[in-house]
Amino acid sequence: MKIAIAGASGRMGRMLIEAVLNDADAQLVGALDRAGSPFLGQDAGAFVGKDTGIKLTDDLDAVFAQADYLIDFTRPEGTIAHIEAALRHDVKLVIGTTGFTAEQKAQLQAAAAKLGIVFAANMSVGVNVTLKLLEFAAQHFSHGYDIEIIEAHHRHKVDAPSGTALMMGEAVAGALGRSLDDCAVYGRHGVTGERDPSSIGFAAVRGGDIVGDHTVLFAGIGERIEITHKSSSRVSYAQGALRAVRFLSARGAGLFDMQDVLGLR
C-alpha cells in the first residue's frame, strides 16, 4: 500500500507516519506539509527517529504522482486542495478532517463519484462501536430523558463542537427519528428559558493537551446514564486510518465511513 500523509508535521501527521512505517504492508511514499512550514525539506522519519528518504514537501502533484492513498487529517481548505489533486491522479482518500462547510461537504461527495473515499470525523474502533451503543440507548431513553453531549479537547483545536460530538448527535437524533439540524442546541448563555425536551444540547471544553473526551448524558428523573469515550493518545486514530486504507484497497469509487470499514451497518 503506497501511502502519503498530509499535515505530516502535525501531531496526527507524525502519529500516522509512525504507524505507516511500522506496518509491514504499508509503504510511505510522500509527506505533505503546508507552504511555508519550517519542516519542509526535513526527512519525514525524523519525527519518529527513523531515516526514510522521504522529504516533507508542499508539492501536491509530486506527492500524488507517487501515491495510491492519501491519509488527510488537516483543515478543510487543505483537504479540498487535496481532493482536487486526488482527482487529477486517481488517488484514494482517507479523510479525518473536521469543520467542513456544507459547500465543502458537497465537493467531497461529488469527488466520491470518481474516487474511493473514507470520510469519518473519528476513526477509532472504540468511538465507532460507541455510536452503535448510543443508537441502542437512544431508542430506549426516547421519552422522559434529556440528552446532552459534552466534549473536551486540547487548547489548539480550532472547531467546536468536535466532529465526533456531531457524529454522536447524529447517531442519537437518527435513532429518535429526528434531524440534528432541527434539534441541536450549541452552548447556552444568559436567560435561555426552559429546556425543550426534544433538543440535544452540546457543550465544548478546550484546555491543556486533552486528546478527546466525549460523554453523552441521558438525564431522567431520579437517574442519569452517561456513555463516555476517552482517548489517551492518537494511536487509535492512526490504526483506524490504516484499517480504512485496507478497506479501500478492495473498493471502487464511493463515499464510505468507519461504520462501513468496521462492518457495523
Curated annotation (Swiss-Prot):
Q: Does the keyword Amino-acid biosynthesis apply?
A: yes
Protein name as it appears in the record: 4-hydroxy-tetrahydrodipicolinate reductase
The residues annotated as the active site are H153 (proton donor/acceptor), K157 (proton donor)
Q: What is its main location?
A: cytoplasm
Q: What function does the entry list?
A: Catalyzes the conversion of 4-hydroxy-tetrahydrodipicolinate (HTPA) to tetrahydrodipicolinate.
Where are the bilayer-spanning segments? none
**Coiled-coil region:** none
State any GO BP term from the record: diaminopimelate biosynthetic process
> Any idea which GO molecular function terms this record carries?
4-hydroxy-tetrahydrodipicolinate reductase; NAD binding; NADP binding; oxidoreductase activity, acting on CH or CH2 groups, NAD or NADP as acceptor
Q: Which NCBIfam families match?
A: dapB (TIGR00036)
Annotated compartments? Cytoplasm
* Protein family according to the UniProt entry: Belongs to the DapB family.
- State the organism's lineage: Bacteria, Pseudomonadati, Pseudomonadota, Betaproteobacteria, Burkholderiales
Residues bound to NAD(+) are: G7, A8, S9, G10, R11, M12, D33, G96, T97, T98, A120, A121, N122, M123
Q: What is its EC number?
A: 1.17.1.8
Q: What does the record give as the reaction this protein catalyses? A: (S)-2,3,4,5-tetrahydrodipicolinate + NAD(+) + H2O = (2S,4S)-4-hydroxy-2,3,4,5-tetrahydrodipicolinate + NADH + H(+); (S)-2,3,4,5-tetrahydrodipicolinate + NADP(+) + H2O = (2S,4S)-4-hydroxy-2,3,4,5-tetrahydrodipicolinate + NADPH + H(+)
Give the record's pathway: Amino-acid biosynthesis; L-lysine biosynthesis via DAP pathway; (S)-tetrahydrodipicolinate from L-aspartate: step 4/4
Q: What is this enzyme's class at the first EC digit? A: oxidoreductase
What is the name of the gene encoding this protein? Answer: dapB
Binding of NADP(+) occurs at R34
Question: For binding (S)-2,3,4,5-tetrahydrodipicolinate, which residues are annotated in this chain's numbering?
Answer: H154, G163, T164
Any single Gene Ontology cellular-component annotation: cytosol
| Keywords from the UniProt entry | Amino-acid biosynthesis, Cytoplasm, Diaminopimelate biosynthesis, Lysine biosynthesis, NAD, NADP, Oxidoreductase
Pfam families from the UniProt entry = DapB_C (PF05173), DapB_N (PF01113)
